[in-house]
Structures are given as C-alpha cells and as structure tokens.
C-alpha cells in the first residue's frame, strides 16, 4: 500500500483502453476507396469464400473490410463507407462495409433484416 506522500509525488496510473477499430479515429463510419476486391478463406474449422475488400480511407489508413450479404457490386475504385465490427474467422479483418450507401448496393431480394443490408422495403 502506497503512503499519501508517495501518491502525491507519483499518482496512480490510469489504464488506457486500446481501440478495437483504430482506423475510424473515434468516428462511427469512414469513407474510403476500394484498392482491391477479393475472396479469402476463413480459419479452421470453417470453410467458405468470404468476400473482402482492401480500402484506402480518407484519413490515410488502409484496412481490410468484409462485404456482408449475398452478392455485391464492388470493384476497384468503388467509394465505400466502412464501420467497425470484426469477422471472427478472418484474421486481420476488423471492419465491415455498409451496404446500401455510396457505391455499395443493397442486397437484392432480402426480406428480413433489411436495414443491415441496405435493402428498400418491398412494395
């Protein structure tokens, strides 16, 4: 136990919390340009071809971002909005692209959970 004199001389250190999404710099979303759109395979025990894009953000960061939903229209030089949220079985992918904003289209034929995939309400 420290004495009061010791604490006056050198106060207790506050533990600093490290951000899970440093490239967003405390913003809810960030805009960026796709530099590469590709598929990659997940860690064991899962098996799939996950759609991922490499994005150069407006603040200079370059990050990998997951493209959720079935089918997408992204290619190189597409302007996308990314949000935080990692993909557990893809190492190094800590961001998601926001569907239905900027150059990213919503998911076609989606009826449930539409707001997460940028799909308009069916007539």
From Swiss-Prot:
Key words of the record: Methylation, Ribonucleoprotein, Ribosomal protein, RNA-binding, rRNA-binding, tRNA-binding
Post-translational modification 3-methylthioaspartic acid, affected residues: 89
A Pfam family: Ribosom_S12_S23
Keyword Transferase set for record: no
Alphabetized PROSITE patterns for the sequence: RIBOSOMAL_S12
GO MF term list: rRNA binding; structural constituent of ribosome; tRNA binding
Region ranges (Disordered): 1-22, 100-123
A biological process term (GO) from this entry: translation
Annotated Gene Ontology cellular component terms: small ribosomal subunit
SUPFAM superfamilies the UniProt entry points to: Nucleic acid-binding proteins
Biased composition (Basic residues): 111-123
Family assignment from sequence similarity: Belongs to the universal ribosomal protein uS12 family.
Subunit note: Part of the 30S ribosomal subunit. Contacts proteins S8 and S17. May interact with IF1 in the 30S initiation complex.
Function: With S4 and S5 plays an important role in translational accuracy. Interacts with and stabilizes bases of the 16S rRNA that are involved in tRNA selection in the A site and with the mRNA backbone. Located at the interface of the 30S and 50S subunits, it traverses the body of the 30S subunit contacting proteins on the other side and probably holding the rRNA structure together. The combined cluster of proteins S8, S12 and S17 appears to hold together the shoulder and platform of the 30S subunit.
Stated name of the protein: Small ribosomal subunit protein uS12
Chain's gene name: rpsL
């Amino acid at each position: 136990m420290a004495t009061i004199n010791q604490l006056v001389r050198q106060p207790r250190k506050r533990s600093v919390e490290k951000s899970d999404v440093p490239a967003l710099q405390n913003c809810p979303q960030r805009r960026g340009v796709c530099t590469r759109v590709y598929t990659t395979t997940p860690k064991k025990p899962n098996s799939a071809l996950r759609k991922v894009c490499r994005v150069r953000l407006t603040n200079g960061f370059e990050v990998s971002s997951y493209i959720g939903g079935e089918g997408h229209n992204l290619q190189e030089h597409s302007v996308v909005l990314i949000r935080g949220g990692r993909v557990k079985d893809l190492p190094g992918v800590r961001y998601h692209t926001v569907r239905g904003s900027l150059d990213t289209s919503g998911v076609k034929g989606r009826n449930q959970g539409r707001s997460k995939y940028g799909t308009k309400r069916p007539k």
